[in-house]
Amino acid sequence: MPNRDKEISLRPAGRSAAASRLQICALGGGRRYDTAFYLCCLEKRPPRTSQDDREVTAFRWSSPPEAIECFKCQEIRFAPPQFYELCRLCNFSSLHELHKFSSDRALEGCERWMSVILTASDGYIQLLPGDDLYPEDPDYTGEKKTIMSTDKKVEDLMKEGSVFHRIVIKNINNLAVYVNIQPKYKHMNPLMINTGCSDYSSRL
């Protein structure tokens, strides 16, 4: 019991909000998630990790590049928001650097984003706030039943744009992050990684 009390008392001091996502409304209704991502830096790997065998069925300690490579090889799956945050973590070359960055901006908070899906002829683009194609009045409640689609290919849409904050989705294991907006709240943009290519790099 003393060890458990110690664990609980240390946990809030070592973590900070890294991102917040509001899931887009599905056309058929169903469950919708309002998710916050937290970052916690530990000096040592926890001696024991357990899962509930429902939402979490297994665990694995990996660096962000290792996790992305496993995703690319279809060993594991990530939803686009998790992939985006892993690409952001690839900016940091050490745990110390990541912890300093997180601590320096801990009081800044983070902006809640809702993605909007644009269906192209050969894939999907998940648009985020600040992107050229992000709607001025997004459908936060799902009441408008708005569907964004085009006959253009993803490549054509990329050539036409200039301000990007998007994730291109060719299939569940082929994602690409494109970001050139100015980040808010002293945050950092993710590395632009395309799992369909083999030449992406990371500082880790």
Residue ranges of each PLM-predicted region?
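Unchanged
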Residues: 1-85, 98-111, 153-157, 162, ...
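Core RNA-modification/binding signature centered on pseudouridine synthases
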Residues: 85, 89, 94-204
